[in-house]
């Protein structure tokens, strides 16, 4: 009798626990509503403008600075990520990995296409009820280096499948750029999509005008945007891309956002790239943070754009970086094994004393497209000496070839300014 009582009690406890788990694991409905002059995203019946970032690092800081959403490229660690996002009060645009033509997938292979759809169905059913889920993202830049338009039929079939399995969340696909051809394909062959997502860098300010010119009058979001891309700016005579300083990046992040995302009523929000750090051409090009977790001036800008308030402690500002009294765009050639002066001008808005960290790297040769993983070059030790408040001495490598010197200006409060200058070591240089 006593044993039966305990068994009933345990069963009741499990039932209550399961009910509580279900209460905390219910989907929050999200939908897009058309308005007279555009569109608005509604989450749980309330307007929701996406103030997001791409990446899963430093999400606590994103919340602290006014962000409300993160974006992923696949469902790796999705359960942990969604649960953590829910605890922090942020949402997730969940990427579904879809194979690309440029990596060898054949969209004429109907069996492989069907197999991929059914694999994605499992993922959708697994995560559709998590309250932090905001939007499903089908693939990433499927139009990059592609030739087969059948990919759009596959995208549409995936979108229809998602709507069948999950009526509570909108579906999009992420486009590299915003070409008229792709817009036409999507309007005619991807009618199950609820919105499109564009990924642009230097041309962000032109997005509203270009979308209109290319025939898109529906809702959209910007799922990647950031500095001038390595393919968009200047380069040296030896094809090394010229990177903006962190201060130059901060200026263009703000101006381009305010000219497009902030004012276009068809835009539902955005995900800045990248809320973290990665090696892509250089270790500093796209990440808003350094490898040590230090925050650049761009993070200050994002806090201002998200909530209208600048942080109390601002990042250092860097200007006028010179190597051998030349700018990065001057095609700097150095002789091997010689000493050269590097100078910079840096200021701190809070008047804090600044220090510097230096690094010399060979120019990266592991160059990929579409954000594919790249390896970081190994630093060359003992190359920078005589460090002062305004510069240092670079001892050029003995081996001929392309290199890049990096400068990190630190304020002691986890804020940083970054800059780099490419140069080429050549025996007969003057």
Question: PLM features: what roles do these ranges have?
Answer:
Residues 396-399:
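Residue-level recognition of secondary-structure-to-loop junctions
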Residues 177-208, 230-237, 276-283:
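Substrate-binding cleft/loops of secretory-pathway carbohydrate-active enzymes
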Residues 35, 43, 47-52, 212-389, ...:
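Substrate-binding clefts and catalytic carboxylate motifs of secreted carbohydrate-active enzymes
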Residues 1-23:
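Bacterial Sec-dependent N-terminal signal peptides
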Residues 27, 32-36, 40-193, 205-206, ...:
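Active-site mouth of glycoside hydrolases
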Residues 419-425:
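C-terminal edge beta-strand
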